[in-house]
Amino acid sequence: MSREIRSVVTGTVYQIEVTVGEQVKLGTDLIILESMKMEIPIVAETDGTVIEVRFNECDSVIEGQVLLMVDPD
């Protein structure tokens, strides 16, 4: 079952570190958000494969929005 990776803050997508199909390990930076001039890394909560990225760099997000989906190994 796919795992939703959600935004922990309201802000802007500063940098996307992964692509669809990429294998990630626990703790890997997936997306960097910017909020109040701070960069907040969103990291993988498990080993797996990125199956969907829902935002582009510079997009605005709100706290709790699904940023991407990871299919756990």
Spans of features found by a protein language model:
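Short low-complexity stretches enriched in small and charged residues
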Residues: 1, 8, 18-26
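Short beta-strand-turn/beta-hairpin segments enriched in glycine/proline and small hydrophobics
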Residues: 1-12, 32-45, 72
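Short histidine-centered loop motifs in beta-beta connectors
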Residues: 15-19, 23, 52-55
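A structural signal for short beta-strand/turn segments enriched in small hydrophobics and glycine
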Residues: 21-30, 58-67
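Generic C-terminal helix-cap and adjacent flexible tail
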Residues: 25, 72-73
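Short alpha-helical linear motifs
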Residues: 51-52, 68-71
